[in-house]
């Protein structure tokens, strides 16, 4: 049994804030820092997995963090370029099926976090094999193959490699972005139902 400690990124819905300490403790983890409204950096021993039945329904999404750059992207000169190069140096040569980026604050009303994530993914793809750029729909991933996930926000950049099944979802952070300008848009409640149905594809 390994005694090594790994840093994870947990997404725990804000509605469970009153139970936050208990949820993290039951997962066998210790909180390091809160990132935005729903994300939390935690540390846990490698022998413990954050997906057992007691907390799996409360930890909406999780990712082992292999690379982090704490900073304020909008105030960092050439953030996209520096971040993409750093990710390339850290993960070059790793076997992955896709590169996906998302915002640390998926509920933000302004577009900056999503635009930042989209631009960062585009630049990162230029440093990796061309076949990774062929994936345009997160749901076409193999749930059992590793993906490089990256989350970016006012707190910085946080990346890791895991399978969609290990993370608990196909999309970075666990949220499906639906454009409000889309004529076929669905309600927020409908989006939540869609996300729940997608989880069935992880098995």
Locations of the language-model features?
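SAM-dependent transferase fold signal centered on methyltransferase-like domains
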Residues: 1-203
């Amino acid at each position: 049994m390994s005694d090594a400690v790994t840093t994870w990124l947990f997404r725990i819905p804000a509605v469970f804030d009153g139970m936050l300490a208990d949820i993290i403790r039951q997962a066998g983890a210790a909180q390091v820092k809160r990132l935005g409204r729903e994300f939390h950096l935690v540390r846990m021993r490698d022998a413990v997995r954050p997906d057992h039945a007691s907390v799996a329904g409360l930890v909406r999404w999780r990712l082992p963090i292999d690379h982090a750059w704490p900073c304020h992207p909008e105030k960092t000169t050439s953030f996209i370029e520096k971040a993409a190069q750093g990710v390339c140096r850290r993960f070059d040569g790793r076997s992955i099926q896709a590169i996906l980026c998302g915002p640390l604050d998926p509920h933000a009303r302004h577009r900056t976090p999503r635009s930042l994530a989209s631009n960062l993914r585009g630049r990162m793809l230029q440093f990796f094999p061309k076949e990774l750029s062929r994936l345009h729909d997160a749901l076409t991933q193999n749930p059992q193959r590793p993906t490089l996930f990256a989350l970016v926000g006012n707190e910085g950049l946080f990346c890791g490699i895991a399978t969609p099944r290990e993370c608990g979802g196909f999309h970075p952070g666990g949220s499906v972005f639906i454009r409000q300008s889309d004529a076929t848009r669905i309600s927020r409640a409908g989006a939540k139902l869609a996300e729940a149905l997608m989880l069935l594809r992880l098995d």
